[in-house]
Amino acid sequence: MRPSRYAPLLCAMVLALAWLSAVAGCSRGGSSKAGRSSSVAGTLPAGVVGVSPAGVTTRVDAPAESTEEEYYQACHAARLWMDAQPGSGESLIEPYLAVVQASPSGVAGSWHIRWAALTPARQAAVIVAARAAANAECG
């Protein structure tokens, strides 16, 4: 069987298309750290946010995003609040998160940013810090 005279052209087109796909797949379209302070929270699809029967967000399936210092601040603020409450441990996580989420101006545990204005990654960081505070693991 004799190769078509268009075979080299077809091969070149396939290679060019493969190269473009690889370049597009490797392009950097991520956000910078400056974008982290956005005042608009991201929206997550249903099922990736855990909400208690009382309506408190207790889980956000996103990677927690905070610096070590921010984590410590959030954890310490949660711990101070928990120490002032009756009860201890895991039972205080949901009530604490309810306070954080209801605050019109944010609290120290959310870096003084309203819950609704935090990105899902920042909401996850607040929840991680609250869980650590309940277990006295702020560091």
UniProtKB/Swiss-Prot annotation:
Signal peptide: 1-25
GO cellular component, one term: plasma membrane
Keyword DNA damage: no
Membrane topology, record value: Lipid-anchor
Short name of any one Pfam family annotated for the protein: LpqV
Top-level taxon of the source organism: Bacteria
Lipid anchor positions (N-palmitoyl cysteine): 26
Subcellular location(s) of the protein: Cell membrane
Keyword terms, alphabetized: Cell membrane, Lipoprotein, Membrane, Palmitate, Signal
Cited InterPro entries: Uncharacterised_LpqV
Lipid attachment locations (S-diacylglycerol cysteine): 26
Main location: membrane
UniProt KW Magnesium keyword: no
Cystine pairings recorded for this chain: none
Protein name: Putative lipoprotein LpqV
Upper taxonomic lineage: Bacteria, Bacillati, Actinomycetota, Actinomycetes, Mycobacteriales
Primary gene name: lpqV
